[in-house]
Design a protein with these regions (language model features):
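Bulky hydrophobic segments
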Residues: 1-164, 181-266, 272-373
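Individual transmembrane alpha-helices with interfacial aromatic-anchor signatures
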Residues: 167-178
Length: 373
């Protein structure tokens, strides 16, 4: 498997890893900043794709274990700069003959070390730009990362193979670290071109002072998932209507500090100008009606009418279509509220507002207050 094939494999596997990381990543961002910054998302996922590509380049292709008969001692090189000696000994390079220069560039003794240098250049750029590492820290982290890759090879993919199937080479660490140093120097371009990490953080905090529709929607999703898991356990102990569990959860739990578990996880809470207890309970009942009773009622009516449907029941078919469009309208409305940062109908009826509980610097809060006036 060549370099291009390995990179294609990384690109194909990336969506699955991205899917697994999305929910935890969003929760961490909401907890830390109160918002999910688009540029930060782009940087994060590109960094994950890059790391996955590097890792796969190190371990692929995976050989047949029955064909591995190597020992650990013969698959390790601890002599530094052996690649320089190999280049002058094995490549066709001759300083006096310019015609050999291009041939030397195509020889493995040149392009393999060159690729090792190039492979870690982006790592240095990421460390300088986004992670704000100094030069010494960048070099140290790169050396450790490269050492991890070499130990992965030396261990035969963490002893899954009877022996190493690739050479663990100290020269690889030298080349990788050199590449990262070059990447660190090139990182000034990203610092000049893109907003700084501090500017990204500041913008995230500013946006996070207001609870977005997506943040609310994610909190509701977390609440309903946790309640469904909880109900699966409670139902075995005692028969309790699911709607009753929902009503107790959304109407009574927020009476304590104005939060459900989903809200607490994403760091925001309910706020009422007056009649907090009464409005909280009223809102909880409306939440159950909106997210459970309305869709369940529509599904029930559609199922009921469908069971009585005959070839000549045009009226019944029309009613089913009408209910289906009502359900579709409900879904579109809910999605629009989340994406357009609008308030849910139950929040409007109950007079509920949301407050972010993410800690923000006083200077940012002051600027945000002045800009909203």
């Amino acid at each position: 498997m060549g370099y291009i094939s390995t990179i294609k494999t990384a690109v194909q596997l990336f969506p699955f890893l991205a899917f697994l990381l999305t929910l935890p990543y969003m929760i961490l961002n909401y907890r830390k900043y109160g918002s999910v910054n688009k540029l930060r998302v782009l940087i994060f996922y590109s960094f994950i794709l890059y790391l996955m590509t590097v890792y796969l380049l190190v371990i692929l292709p995976l050989p047949d274990p029955s064909k591995i008969h190597t020992s650990y001692s013969e698959m390790v090189n601890l002599q530094p700069f052996a690649f320089v000696v190999d280049f002058f000994k094995k490549s066709p390079f001759d300083l006096a003959q310019t015609g050999t220069w291009i041939q030397a560039l195509k020889h493995p003794t040149f392009y393999v070390p060159a690729f090792n240098v190039l492979m870690l250049i982006p790592f240095g750029m990421y460390l300088r730009y986004y992670f704000k590492c100094g030069f010494k820290k960048t070099i140290l982290l790169t050396a450790l990362f490269s050492l991890f890759l070499e130990l992965t090879q030396l261990s035969g993919l963490y002893f899954m193979y009877p022996g190493p199937y690739r050479l663990a080479d100290v020269d690889d660490i030298i080349q990788n670290t050199t590449g990262c140093g070059v990447g660190y120097l090139l990182g000034w371009f990203l610092v000049w071109l893109l907003p700084t990490r501090d500017e990204i953080d500041e913008h995230s905090f500013r946006v996070g002072t207001r609870v977005s529709g997506f943040r609310m929607g994610l909190a509701f999703l977390i609440d309903f998932v946790m309640l469904s898991l909880l109900y699966a356990v409670i139902e075995r102990l005692e028969t309790i209507p699911y709607v009753a569990v929902l009503a107790v959860y959304f109407a009574l739990i927020p009476l304590w500090r104005g939060k459900t578990l989903g809200m607490a996880l994403l760091k925001f809470r309910l706020h009422f100008d007056k009649q907090k207890w009464l409005r909280t309970i009223w809102r909880g009942i409306l939440v159950v009606g909106y997210f459970y009773l309305i869709p369940q009622g529509l599904f029930y009516l559609i199922s009921l009418l469908n069971s009585d449907l005959t070839d000549n029941s045009l009226l019944t078919l029309s009613m089913i279509l009408l209910l289906f469009f009502a359900l579709l309208l409900y879904l579109i409305l809910t999605l629009a509220i989340v994406l357009l940062n609008r308030r849910f109908p139950f929040d409007r009826l109950a007079g509920a507002e949301y407050e972010s509980t993410v800690r923000v610097k006083k200077e940012l809060l002051k600027d945000e207050t002045e800009s909203s006036k």
